[in-house]
């Protein structure tokens, strides 16, 4: 059984109709910002895994609800970052995923698995980089990720590939950089521009 839970119940019902099996894919309304509602649904349906496909602003209530109800957990974007309070363009504050990673030991003690950041990057980019390290190259000096797309969704004039608010936040927050020998540091947004020509057909 897979519970389709959404704040907009009609959208969950659309998915259910496409799947043509109401018993196997029950629909529920949920406010992902309210941990107690998520816990109640998990207990009602005997959920074993919570797959979070919400905007990352809702990650922590969902993540914490999974822990409290003994569910394994997956998300696509990790807990949000926060700039350093006094020196945002030199020092990192709270990095993406810090709030989740700091709970790893207690999840492990409870026998629960949380796979976070399984979207494009981190996520797919990490898998590709590890594959390249293990099977394609003798030595890697740097891994760089560049985004480019010509995404089109029928019926929409503008279609971002993820939450538009998350994309804006990622562009405006100080970029967090890690360098061997230097560790983590930040710089001002757009302060170190790079011109990169994508292959034909992208961008």
Describe each PLM feature range.
Residues 2-3:
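Short beta-strand element of Class I
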Residues 29-49, 54, 58-62:
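Conserved Rossmann-fold cofactor-binding substructure of NAD(P)-dependent oxidoreductases
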């Amino acid at each position: 059984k897979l519970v389709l839970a959404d704040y907009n119940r009609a959208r969950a019902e659309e998915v259910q109709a496409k799947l043509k099996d109401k018993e196997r894919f029950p629909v529920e309304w949920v406010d992902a910002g309210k941990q107690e509602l998520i816990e109640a649904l998990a207990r009602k349906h005997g959920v074993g895994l919570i797959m979070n496909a919400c905007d990352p602003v809702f990650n922590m209530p969902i993540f914490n609800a999974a822990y409290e109800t003994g569910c394994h957990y997956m998300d696509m974007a990790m807990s949000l970052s926060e700039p350093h309070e006094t020196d945002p363009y030199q020092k990192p504050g709270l990095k993406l995923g810090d709030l989740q990673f700091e709970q790893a030991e207690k999840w492990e003690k409870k026998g629960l698995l949380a796979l976070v950041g399984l979207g494009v990057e981190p996520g797919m980019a990490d898998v590709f980089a590890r594959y390249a390290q293990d099977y394609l190259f003798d030595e890697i000096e740097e891994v760089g990720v560049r985004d480019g797309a010509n995404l089109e969704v029928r019926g929409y004039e503008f279609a971002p590939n993820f939450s538009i608010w998350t994309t804006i936040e990622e562009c405006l927050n100080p970029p967090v950089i890690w360098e061997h020998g230097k560790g983590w540091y930040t710089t001002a947004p757009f302060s170190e521009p790079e011109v990169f020509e994508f292959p034909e057909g992208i961008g």
